[in-house]
């Protein structure tokens, strides 16, 4: 409003376009910024636009662009889908601290939870790089994805954004033909089209056998390191 007021009534005033972002606590990503610049390049840019949501009521949202990776070759990004109280978040926090304290790598971590805490959905977003990390948004184009709950394959789009030639780790009771049968077709198609390397382990059974209860983090983080 201050900018518009400064130019109000002046000759040769520039085109001033405004919009909203972060609605509903949505993340703001590079793809959304690209959409804003493409809107500004139009002969008649849309004013009072929104990014990050699909506005199917007043139709103010800009078209969603494909997510891009800005970290460069030295950046490694990972996402871990876990269950509240299974130790995934705690193990990832420790991993970031260990790598940050004992290597020359720059580290960044974001963690998201649902309201149920124990037994609820968790997602860890990790970045490691040779140069300072200035990405102030969640991981959207990971090199590595770990799904610690097999039911999430049918509940969430866990392969979304996983880069070509990336890696995927699954904690599951399925193996062999049973695994191939139970994987959703869209997941298998994504793996095939993007040359994804897939690892699977029954970390739940291993944790119970060695007395860790439902704390599968030790088994899975060790496997993630090997992957």
Residue ranges, per PLM feature:
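Conserved small/polar residues in nucleotide/adenosyl-binding loops
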Residues: 222-227
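Glycine-centered, small-residue-biased loops immediately flanking beta-strands
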Residues: 166
